[in-house]
């Protein structure tokens, strides 16, 4: 991997492209230390240097766990479902996307009960049920926090835009890269950040249909011409003379 300072500058440039620094018009008191400045429109901007530092801290915490299957990634926000699943795929963690079943971390008689050693959430406000239950079970929490995110029961806050699909994907991408690097699994990260982006199923289906139509056009498939050729072939077969109504026995009987 490139030197730390070069990697830091490259990562910050990616964060700017993915709009990770754009916060909201509200700010929590505990998030003020991560704010860079406030624009004329009233939007608070996040200090990306502190974001990068918090990613390094969170990655070191995750890397200390022997079995990464004990790390649970929770995301009820739709834009965070695919990044959470990809993070789990590349690190070996366990992902829980969609609705979080109450009692998963506290009720031992439920089928989905689990006792993770670490919890990662995409948004502490949306995933508040998981954060509250982790406080009952004494489970550390790492959270992607926007300027208006509550930090109660959050142990490590990664300041970022946790509402944009590009920003969420980039955060999980960088976190997975650092975890694998610290655990010695890879020296070169070949995975593209685009793989972590959330994709709309309807948009993906429409694009697939459009690609098939373009492929057919490129192959020169003429549906109308094919129909005309089929009709001509049918007429040709229909004009063939012969006793098609005779039985097979008559044909064999008259054979020399």
Swiss-Prot record:
Pfam families: Ribosomal_S2 (PF00318)
Record GO biological process: ribosomal small subunit assembly; translation
Chief localisation class: cytoplasm
Record-linked CDD domains: RPS2
PROSITE patterns: RIBOSOMAL_S2_1, RIBOSOMAL_S2_2
GO molecular function, one term: structural constituent of ribosome
Keyword Cytoplasm applies: yes
Record's function text: Required for the assembly and/or stability of the 40S ribosomal subunit. Required for the processing of the 20S rRNA-precursor to mature 18S rRNA in a late step of the maturation of 40S ribosomal subunits.
Family: Belongs to the universal ribosomal protein uS2 family.
PANTHER family linked: 40S RIBOSOMAL PROTEIN SA
The name this protein goes by in its record: Small ribosomal subunit protein uS2
Organism in which the protein naturally occurs: Cryptosporidium hominis
Origin organism lineage: Eukaryota, Sar, Alveolata, Apicomplexa, Conoidasida
